[in-house]
Regions:
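GG-anchored amphipathic helix commonly corresponding to the ABC/SMC/Rad50 NBD signature/C-loop
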Residues: 69-92
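A short helix-turn-beta junction within AAA+ P-loop NTPase domains corresponding to the substrate/partner-engaging
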Residues: 132-134
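Conserved beta-strand segments of the P-loop GTPase G domain that flank and frequently precede/overlap
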Residues: 14-16, 61, 66, 89-93, ...
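Glycine-rich phosphate-binding loops of nucleotide-dependent enzymes
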Residues: 19-24, 53, 70-73, 80
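Conserved catalytic loops of ABC-family nucleotide-binding domains
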Residues: 84-88, 96-130
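Conserved ABC nucleotide-binding domain
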Residues: 49-69, 84-85
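ABC ATPase nucleotide-binding domain signature region
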Residues: 1-47
């Protein structure tokens, strides 16, 4: 599923190099824990995404433990773009995901990009994945 078929004008993949330091990383594997800690600050983002992605569980206290990782990443991207007004978001850690999980994440990010036109860069060490989405 190449980028151009999904029509992601603001979403791209980039090769992740060692020692990249950015203040606006969205860490993939620790996001569930991060959301549980920061839940009160992200309630608006969670409510928006519950509606936008039609998440069945609407109890905000349990959503961070029940939602899939792709939705949790989308919540964090939304929170940083809309609430913290960052110009660019970097997502890392997708090398541990299956192709299906990555496609689901891209679809969720596409929904966000319809509402906001900021750069979202997905970092990867996987050259095959990188070439596939160019």
């Amino acid at each position: 599923m190449p980028n151009n078929q999904l029509n992601f004008p603001n979403i791209q993949m980039s090769y992740e190099t060692e020692n990249q330091l950015f203040s606006n990383f969205v860490p993939f594997l620790s996001l569930k824990t991060h959301l549980a800690i920061q839940r009160k600050n992200q309630q608006n983002a969670i409510e928006w995404l519950v509606k936008e992605f039609q998440i069945a569980e609407t109890n905000l206290d349990v959503l961070p433990t029940q939602a899939d990782y792709q939705t949790l990443i989308a919540i964090q991207v939304y929170q940083q773009l809309f609430i913290q007004h960052k110009d660019c978001i970097y997502i890392r850690g997708i090398d541990y995901c299956t192709t299906w999980q990555i496609q689901q994440l891209l679809l969720k990010l596409k929904q966000i990009s319809r509402h906001y036109h900021k750069q979202i860069i997905i970092l990867t060490h996987n050259l095959t994945l990188l070439n596939y989405h160019e």
